[in-house]
Structures are given as C-alpha cells and as structure tokens.
Curated annotation (Swiss-Prot):
Belongs to the CTP synthase family. The lineage of its organism: Bacteria, Pseudomonadati, Pseudomonadota, Gammaproteobacteria, Lysobacterales. This is CTP synthase. It comes from Xanthomonas oryzae pv. oryzae (strain KACC10331 / KXO85). UTP binds at S13, K186, T187, K188, P189, T190, Q191, K222. Signal peptide: none annotated.
Length: 554
C-alpha cells in the first residue's frame, strides 16, 4: 500500500501548492524513493481540453494523450516520473465514471449518492494512480471551504481513517500575510483555515506557511500552538527569487525528514543529493549571456497559457548559462503594425493556438523572421503559420491558408487530419462534425528525421518522440510543390503520412525551424530540450553577430 501525502490549500488560491508538492517530491526522489504525483481538480469539466486558455491557462499533454491541468507540467519538471491520464482527475470525470457504472447496473439498484459512491470512485482513482510507488503526493485543487472540493476532502479523510498516519499524511499550504502598516505577519488566516479543515475531520500533520518573508520562530510557535501541529512541522515558505530553488529550501528545513519519520521509510532512503538543483539555481543567478526572445501568441494577456513554452525557453538558456528575457506580443496587434515591435529581437517563437484570430499576425511574423534572417521557432500553429507564409510568399500560392480559417481557400496547405495512427497502432478517424473534446491527435508520437538537416543535428538521432495536440496538419498534396520551392521537410511520422518538422536550408537562413509537436512538454530545468537549446544558441549567435567561439555550459 503506497504511503500518500495529501496537499491542500487554504485562505486563497494560487499560493503554489503544485510547486511546493513537486519540490518535496524531488527531494524524496533524490533520496532514492520512487515517487509519483497526482492532481484532483474540483471543476466539472471532464478535462481542461476544451477550456479557454484565458480562464484555465495551459493544457498540458502527457505521453498517453491526456489533456491535463498545467500543474502536471510542474510535476514533470521537478520529478523524473512520466505521468499519465491516471494522474489527473476532475469532478467531471468522477461523475462520468459513476454515472456510467450506474447505467450498467453496477450498483445493483442502489440510490447513487456522494457518499459512498462518489467518494469510493475518488479513492479508486487514487489507488489506481499510486500503486507500485514508494510515495505519492496528491494535490487537491481549490481552497479549503470551497463547496466543490468537499467530496475530495471527505474521500481523503476516509483514506486517513482506514490507513492510519503511517500511510497517509496531510500537508496544508496556507497564507501568512504581511501587513506593511503594522510591520507584522498575521497568523489568524492560517488558524481559521486549519479550523475549517478540522471541522470536516482533517488534522494537518504539516503546515507550509506562504509569506513574503521568512516566518520567524516566534510566529511558528504561535501557529503550532493554535493549530495542534508540531512546531518542527510548521515550515516557512517565503517568496524566493528562483522557484527551482524551492527543493533546496525545503530540504534545509527538514520537510523530507518529517515524511521519512512518519512513514517509517528510513531503511529505504539515502542522503539527498540536490547538486543538480543547486547547479540550476547557480545558472539562473549567474548568467554569462543574455538574449531577448519575442513570443508572438494569441493569449499573451494570460501568460499561464504558455507556461511550458516560457519555462522551456528558460531551460534552453540554463544549459548555456544564458538569461532569456521574454517579450510577449499579441499576434492580432501585429496584423495592423509595421513589425517595429520585432526590431532588435534576438529570436522569435510562435507557439500553438486555435482559431483564426491572430493567425495573419503569426503569418506576417514568420515572413518577417524569414526575410530578416531572425532565428524563428514555430510550434504547432506556429509551424502552420510558417507553411502558409512560405506557400504564399515563396511558392506563389496566392491565398494559401489553413482550412481551419478558410475552408474555401484555393490552396489549403494546412488541412484537417481525417485519419492517423495512435501510439498503440490503432487507426483513429474524425471529421468536421466530431466533438471538440478528446478528438485531436494527442500524446507521444515517433517521427523520423532527415539526415543532414538542422533538426537531425539538434536531436542527434534519427528517430525521436514528441507529444502532440492538434487537429490540423500539413496537406500532403503540397509536399512536392513546397519542397521544389525550397522548403525542407526534415521530420515525418514513421509511416511517412504526416509532416512533423519543416525548416529552411541553412545557406538561406541561419536558423528557421518549425515543428507540429509540442517539444515544450518534454523540457526540464535539469536537462533542457535540444530544440530550445539550439534556438537559444541561435539567438545568442545573432546577437553576437556570428558563430560563438565556445559553448558555456550550466
């Protein structure tokens, strides 16, 4: 039976439960434990796949094609375990499962209720996702006191009652606000948050106190007294300059030891080696170079919509001790501009998106980068924009477009994928009338790279696998025509049916590459991703006015 750490949040949302949980997980992993993580989200959507990026932020995709909460991106950036559909569960999915069972007659005519049927299904999902691991951390979305979270809190209360403290731990993240006028940290919100938890039968074992500054020992003692939590289990989580330094901070305060002692794991663990995280923090704090990258997107007012892209760019810089400054530009604004915003930029990245709003701005951005020899990296919709640009302005295919935006285009160089093969070898089909949810080409897919190309050089191997999330694809009818016009197709699906990567010859452009997949989902601060590392290096070379003499390594 896997020991479980349940992480809840109080007072306000967005305190950083995911980062705190992932940081603890990284320490436990460094001590030799096999760790997994899970997110329980209280919203009624089955998954976030059809939710607006402005409301929910990024949709993070796992190897098996699950469309999940962006917190799973945090988890995978901090731990080595690759997550799956099992690790992201919503209220909508729980109810969908229960209703399906009721329709099948699995409940034998019983009245289906929140307790026990909904809570039992939550517990079943927890058991399924965490089996076979030494420790599992489970984040409960939302804030204690929200009506939506109650079934999840009841379910984890039942787990603790049945398994005991040696197999289930409650960790509560709460706000300790600093009142500048009084010059004091206030503990009352934390006391009330714990009181709310205790009213539903949950007594926290550990408190993580988020604040602008370190919580002094006197306040920690006060919090411990009023919340019935051991003083050594009241952990200070102040604001820090580098989020990737959180594992080092939590290790310093001994949070991992609390887990080891409560779960009696002493015989399984070694000393924690966080040298990789120390190197990451050092590279962030002491860069040797600096570049500015323009990110031309549709949802730039809500930058969480591109969370993994932003992090992957920074990871690419970390690997060469380079600070990456991001300049966020709204694609729609560029449609009516002279592209002055792209002057003095070291590199341009156009990320994914859906719909026609801002697409012409992305096409014009590709054209600008191509003509002005600015390093260009297109991802998903950014690749499609690059293909449309090349078709219109180089291959002379007037009015070329994607059928997503213009179904009457005389040259639909980007079209709907009607059939493709999944990672398991099964054939999936869809058409214009298919549901939006869960009908895309999703998950990890292999592709073969063309020898002698930039993509092949960056990856360093012939076959690679990347995660996908898209409905539209390069139209194969235009392959020959665009290749004859000079476009290089450097990556294709293993069955040669889908174009995965396009680029420009290096004798015509220093660095112009676009891919249909989402490589940002496989980038981590400790390893980076070859495409992002190569892109940042190209930006450095543009800034330096030529080839770099030597590589700086983190």
């Amino acid at each position: 039976m896997t020991p479980l750490i349940f992480v809840t949040g109080g007072v306000v949302s967005s305190l950083g439960k995911g980062i705190a949980a992932a940081s603890l997980a990284s320490i436990l992993e460094a001590r030799g434990l096999k760790v997994t993580m899970m997110k329980l989200d209280p919203y009624i959507n089955v998954d976030p796949g059809t939710m607006s990026p402005f409301q929910h932020g990024e949709v993070y995709v796992t190897d098996d094609g699950a469309e999940t909460d962006l917190d799973l991106g945090h988890y995978e950036r901090y731990v080595r375990t690759r997550l799956s559909r099992k690790n992201s569960v919503t209220t909508g999915r729980i109810y969908e499962n229960v209703i399906r069972k009721e329709r099948r007659g699995d409940y034998l005519g019983a009245t289906v209720q929140v307790i026990p049927h909904i809570t039992d299904e939550i517990r079943r999902c927890i058991d399924e996702a965490t089996a076979g691991f030494d420790v599992a951390l489970i984040e409960i979305g939302g804030t204690v006191g929200d009506i939506e979270s109650l079934p999840f809190l009841e379910a984890i209360r039942q787990v603790r009652t049945e398994r005991g403290a040696e197999k289930a731990m409650f960790m509560h993240l709460t706000l300790v606000p600093y009142i500048a006028a009084a010059g004091e940290l206030k503990t009352k919100p934390t006391q009330h948050s714990v009181k709310e938890l205790r009213s539903i039968g949950i007594q926290p074992d550990v408190l993580l106190c988020r604040s602008e500054q370190a919580v002094p020992d006197s306040e920690r003692r006060k919090i411990a007294l009023f919340t019935n939590v051991s003083e050594r289990a009241v952990i200070s989580c102040p604001d820090i300059d580098v989020l990737y330094g959180m594992p080092l901070e939590l290790l310093r305060q001994g949070l991992d030891e609390l887990v080891i002692v409560q779960f009696k794991l002493r015989d399984k663990v070694a000393a924690a080696d966080l040298s990789e995280w120390a190197a990451v923090v050092d590279a962030v704090k002491h860069p040797l170079d600096e570049v500015t990258i323009a990110v031309v997107g549709k949802y730039v007012d809500h930058q969480d919509a591109y969370k993994s892209v932003a992090e992957a760019l920074r990871h690419g810089g970390l690997r060469q001790r380079t600070k990456v400054n991001l300049k966020w530009l709204e694609a729609q604004d560029l449609e009516r501009s002279d592209m002055a915003a792209l002057q003095d930029i070291d590199g341009i990245l156009v990320p994914g998106g859906f719909g026609d709003r801002g697409f012409e701005g992305k096409v014009q951005t590709s054209k600008f980068a191509r003509e002005h020899k600015v390093p260009y990296f297109g991802i998903c919709y950014g690749m499609q924009a690059a293909v449309v640009d090349y078709a219109r302005h180089v291959a002379d295919l007037d009015a070329a477009n994607s059928t997503e935006n213009d179904r009457q285009s005389p040259h639909p160089v980007i079209g709907l994928i009607t059939e493709w093969r999944t990672a398991t070898g099964e054939v999936e089909k869809r058409d214009e009338k298919s549901d939006l949810g869960g009908t895309m080409r999703l998950g990890l897919q292999e592709q073969r790279l063309k020898p002698g190309t930039l993509a092949r050089e960056l990856y360093g191997k012939d076959v690679v696998a990347e995660r996908h999330r898209h409905r539209y694809e390069f139209n194969n009818r235009y392959r020959t025509q665009l290749e004859d016009a000079g476009l290089v197709i450097s990556g294709k699906s293993m069955d040669d049916t889908l174009v995965e990567v396009v680029e420009l010859p290096r004798d015509t452009h220093p660095w112009f590459l676009a891919c249909q997949a989402h490589p940002e989902f496989l980038s981590t601060p400790r390893d980076g991703h070859p495409l992002f590392i190569g892109f940042v290096r190209a930006a450095r070379e543009k800034k330096a006015g030529g080839k770099l003499l030597k590589e700086a390594r983190a």
